[in-house]
Amino acid sequence: MEEDDICIQNAAWNKLYRRELMGELRFPTGKYYEDIVYTTMLLARSQKTVYLDLALYNYVLEREGSIMGEGLGSRLFTDQIPAYEEKEAFLRSIGREDLADVHRYFFYKRLLLYYIALGKSQKDMKEKYRRVIRERLLTDRGEMDRVYACRAANPKEKKKMEIFLKSPKLYLAVIRVNERFLIPVKQRLRRH
């Protein structure tokens, strides 16, 4: 079955590639989150991809030295966010505005999740990086309608973003109410 709407994760560990496809393309050394751009460039070269909805590999997240277990840290902002921006620029450079907007939509969702998660960080880190996220989203405000009109977008996510842009404090309060009260009630109702 051919399916253009399957969202493929950036991770390199869950893919097999033909060597010829890689050509001269290599992972950059000394960079974290390098698979975000690398995987996108590699998939853009491919004439055919096959997706198996089958677990054939057991990835260990808590591996010593793995950045997957680091949680929120400065690398997210110094390496990961720039990698997402580079990925989007690449998608636009090859004429895939549609995919660039889908990517941006998921990027915005991720930034809102980071904003919430930063609540558990040390005060100086929390304030610094929440400010970075807030400024980025306010800067992008003019592009929100286009991005949230992409094929992958959920209208509820746009509402969350609108609340955040009006007041990050209100956004956090709404999320807390949702997590503490609304989600548990919905889960109980589904069980009955």
PLM ranges: what are they?
Residues 28-40, 80-85, 170-174:
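Short charge-dense sequence patches
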Residues 98-106:
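All-alpha amphipathic helical-bundle segments outside canonical DNA-binding/catalytic cores
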Residues 50-52, 102, 145-147:
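General small-molecule cofactor/ligand-binding pocket signal
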Residues 120-192:
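Membrane-interface aromatic/basic loop that binds lipid-linked glycans or pyrophosphate carriers
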Residues 56-63, 69-98, 110-113, 117-144:
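Catalytic core of nucleotide-sugar-dependent glycosyltransferases
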